[in-house]
């Protein structure tokens, strides 16, 4: 590459300035003489530190070029394997693809939870701004706001029909909403602190809630009465989730444990203690995942002939763990997130696990091989929640950046 006379002159002056300002006096005077430079004060100012500046900007550009090259390669891969042009993927293997289809703004504070409606093409989001918002995920349209809570809404849950929505809040209440008329039909009081999690039981006639008051409570939908209290956690209970048939509930806590409870007797069936920090989130494995789990863990089907149940947990220790509840053992630990794990869920097809974290990413795990197969830089800030639609190819995420993003899967 040939430099023009002007460029050569600039380079020589920059080198001369570098030699002089770093104390290479002898080299400076020889170089100045050989390059026939007449340095004066005006020029000196202009070329002060120029060589270092050019040097660092070249390094910065190189780094940027490498980043862009790797993004380009990723995009090429997407194009050949994921697009409609390349090989057809089985829907069981569809995963979210960047960029997001929609980035929706409306909440005025961090988004705390995002969930899909079980029937209609809507999703619901909860936020620290004390509101619940309803959106159409296919068009990206905002539909309405449900107001009633007086403090941060922490969690939301539909019943299986999608006619009822439960919500819980730092205002210490749980509310039940008629999702057809969008009205609050019941408010439940009983917890003594922030209610951090809520879930409607599979049969639809009870609700479970978890609170910073260290308890889990079960409520009757019909009357709003508290019918059971589960005690055992030693700190704030972060999340509670019933299993598919509603005979068990799992909970996780600041006490670094995951507990599984028998609903009928309130007995704690398992206390799982391998995390080294607050356990933020849990999720039951769907039956579609059982064969992959057996392959991954080499666990033979038990004497009873039925594997599982299995549970996932995500923690501030940055790991995700998979547990076999029948034996109370950790089957695997997935390591890769660089910050607190805030959401974890099985892919409906059962082959993958999705997680989101305070490292601002969503990760897709091929857990059979215990590896992270894809990382999406999802938001500008911590990713607090994610949901994978059970039948449509969509994932939704919520973040402290106050946005909700809809991702298409293919």
UniProtKB/Swiss-Prot annotation:
- Segments annotated as WD repeats: 106-147, 148-187, 190-229, 232-271, 274-333, 336-377, 379-410
For the LisH domain, which residue ranges apply? 7-39
Q: What is this protein called?
A: Lissencephaly-1 homolog
A single GO molecular function, which one?
Answer: protein heterodimerization activity
Q: Which UniProt keywords apply?
A: Cell cycle, Cell division, Coiled coil, Cytoplasm, Cytoskeleton, Developmental protein, Differentiation, Microtubule, Mitosis, Neurogenesis, Repeat, Transport, WD repeat
Tell where it localizes: Cytoplasm, Cytoskeleton; Cytoplasm, Cytoskeleton, Microtubule organizing center, Centrosome
Matching SUPFAM superfamilies, A to Z? Lissencephaly-1 protein (Lis-1, PAF-AH alpha) N-terminal domain, WD40 repeat-like
GO cellular component terms, semicolon-separated: 1-alkyl-2-acetylglycerophosphocholine esterase complex; centrosome; cytoplasm; microtubule; microtubule associated complex
Alphabetized Pfam families for the sequence: LisH_PAC1 (PF24951), WD40 (PF00400)
Q: Which GO terms describe its biological process?
A: cell differentiation; cell division; establishment of mitotic spindle orientation; microtubule sliding; nervous system development; reelin-mediated signaling pathway
Task: Report if keyword Transmembrane is assigned.
Answer: no
Tell me, how does this one assemble? Can self-associate. Component of the cytosolic PAF-AH (I) heterotetrameric enzyme, which is composed of PAFAH1B1 (beta), PAFAH1B2 (alpha2) and PAFAH1B3 (alpha1) subunits. The catalytic activity of the enzyme resides in the alpha1 (PAFAH1B3) and alpha2 (PAFAH1B2) subunits, whereas the beta subunit (PAFAH1B1) has regulatory activity. Trimer formation is not essential for the catalytic activity. Interacts with dynein, dynactin, nde1 and ndel1.
Coiled-coil stretches noted in the UniProt entry, renumbered to this chain: 56-82
UniProt KW Cytoplasm keyword: yes
Which family does the similarity line name?
Answer: Belongs to the WD repeat LIS1/nudF family.
* Species classification: Eukaryota, Metazoa, Chordata, Craniata, Vertebrata
């Amino acid at each position: 590459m040939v430099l023009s006379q002007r460029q050569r002159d600039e380079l020589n002056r920059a080198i001369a300035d570098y030699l002089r300002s770093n104390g290479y006096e002898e080299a400076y005077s020889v170089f100045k003489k050989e390059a026939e430079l007449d340095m004066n004060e005006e020029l000196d100012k202009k070329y002060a530190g120029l060589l270092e500046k050019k040097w660092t900007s070249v390094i910065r550009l190189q780094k940027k070029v490498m980043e862009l090259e790797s993004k380009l390669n990723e995009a090429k891969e997407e194009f050949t394997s994921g697009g409609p042009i390349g090989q057809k993927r089985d829907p069981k293997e569809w995963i979210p693809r960047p960029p997001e289809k929609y980035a929706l703004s409306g909440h005025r504070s961090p988004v705390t939870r995002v969930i899909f409606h079980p029937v209609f093409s809507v999703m619901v989001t909860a936020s620290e701004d004390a509101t619940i918002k309803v959106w159409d995920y296919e068009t990206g349209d905002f539909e309405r706001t449900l107001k009633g809570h007086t403090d941060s809404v922490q969690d939301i849950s539909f019943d299986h029909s999608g006619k009822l929505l439960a919500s819980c809040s730092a205002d210490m209440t749980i509310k039940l909403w008629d999702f057809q008329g969008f009205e609050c039909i019941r408010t439940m009081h009983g917890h003594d602190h922030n209610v951090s999690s809520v879930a409607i039981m599979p049969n639809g006639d009870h609700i479970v809630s978890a609170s910073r008051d260290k308890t889990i409570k079960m409520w009757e939908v019909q009357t709003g009465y508290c019918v059971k209290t589960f005690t055992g956690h030693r700190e704030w209970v972060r999340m509670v989730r019933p299993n598919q048939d509603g005979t068990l509930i799992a909970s996780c806590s600041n006490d670094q444990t995951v507990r599984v409870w028998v609903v009928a007797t309130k007995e704690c069936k398992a206390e799982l203690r391998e995390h080294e920090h607050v356990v933020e989130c849990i999720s039951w494995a769907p039956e579609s995942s059982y064969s992959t789990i057996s392959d991954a863990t080499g666990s033979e089907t038990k004497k009873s002939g039925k594997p599982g149940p299995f549970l996932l947990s995500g923690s501030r220790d940055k790991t995700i763990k998979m547990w076999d509840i029948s034996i109370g053992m950790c089957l695997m630990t997935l390591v890769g997130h660089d910050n607190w794990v805030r959401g974890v869920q099985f892919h409906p097809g059962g082959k993958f696990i999705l997680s989101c974290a305070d490292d601002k990413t969503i990760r897709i795990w091929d857990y059979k091989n215990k590896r992270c197969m894809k990382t999406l830089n999802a938001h500008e800030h911590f990713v607090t929640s994610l949901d994978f639609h059970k039948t449509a190819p969509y994932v939704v995420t919520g973040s402290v950046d106050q946005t909700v993003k809809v991702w298409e899967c293919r």
